Amino acid sequence: MAEGKKTDDYTIQMDSIDQGNKSFEAPPPPQPRSPPSGSLSNNPILPVLAYCGSSILMTVMNKYVLSGTDFNLNFFLLCIQSLVCIIAIQTCKSCGLITYRDFSADEARKWFPITLLLIGMIYTGSKALQFLSIPVYTIFKNLTIILIAYGEVLWFGGSVTGLTLFSFGLMVLSSIIAAWADIKHAVESNGDATAKVSTLNAGYIWMLVNCLCTSSYVLGMRKRIKLTNFKDFDTMFYNNLLSIPVLIVLSAFLEDWSSTNVNRNFPPMDRNSIVFAMILSGLSSVFISYTSAWCVRVTSSTTYSMVGALNKLPIAISGLIFFDAPVTFPSVSAIVVGFVSGIVYAVAKIKQNAKPRTGVLPTANPPVSASSQSMRDSLRS
């Protein structure tokens, strides 16, 4: 589309050539179109705030549902979220707000392995978030970036710059500090320290598996998307549509649907609020995709990268505000180091994009669609 625009701008109109002088003046270079000054939709502050708010909303709503007493219907939660997402984007398509291709059995067959990786990723992510606090979960999610980067090196011939490597070191350091702060607080706090440490260890194991699943999903999607040529909402449509039947089967056969367990997961006093949070968490994934595309359109991809890095801080702080996450010097230090690592990584990506494209990580080179990038950011958040 951009190439077509360039061609139109520099096309020579033969009837405008001065036949007497046998010469002509080249048309002036195209001027950037400034958005209408009075339009709220073109105010760069609004999409940035909307994107950050959507990311926080999704994480907080998921944590609220998963932090219930002995919640164990994770597959059902993910199924509801996928169903809500399909209804939402289909409604938006009917209203002309977004567009994506119609369902094709052949495309579904090609994409189904990616959907299975997605299910593994979101399930292990929900289990990790269930056992860990939001700040620790957010910090450890940064480790996925390292796995993806070196996966690109192994399978796509990429390379890692020195600044990127430095950001990786900060990510690992922040994760070590966060784990140490969590275990230290569990040992020193009142109650059964052994049980608390055991819960944290389970969370760390789920987090490790989630990082592996997430990197496999992102790398697999990068390779598979060449076969389907999916755009932003095509990916969202097929991911959620294909995951629904799988999640229904997994929930029906692997989860306890006895009346006792259902009442434990959905206490009568909190049932409506839990269901509302489940629906809202499903809508938030659509909000993230839409607001990230809005953010890139109104600002720039560079600004969007920095917003994604800065967004880690409010997400981590939301865990301190809305939930009983320990506020100690080590835990705050881990958040700060993780925040700085995100900024350094974003700066490294920006510098890579500014350099010639030889010898640079493929993840930084191709122009990534806004909602595809936002999907990666939401998985890290």
UniProtKB/Swiss-Prot annotation:
SUPFAM superfamilies reported for this sequence: Multidrug resistance efflux transporter EmrE (SSF103481)
Cytoplasmic side: 1-44, 92-109, 151-159, 221-234, 295-302, 348-381
Family per similarity comment: Belongs to the TPT transporter family. SLC35D subfamily.
Polar residues bias locations: 366-381
Region (Disordered): 19-41, 358-381
Chief localisation class: Golgi
UniProt entry keywords in alphabetical sequence: Cytoplasmic vesicle, Endoplasmic reticulum, Golgi apparatus, Membrane, Sugar transport, Transmembrane, Transmembrane helix, Transport
Protein name: GDP-mannose transporter
Localisation per UniProt entry: Golgi apparatus membrane; Cytoplasmic vesicle membrane; Endoplasmic reticulum membrane
Role summary: Involved in the import of GDP-mannose from the cytoplasm into the Golgi lumen.
Protein topology in the membrane: Multi-pass membrane protein
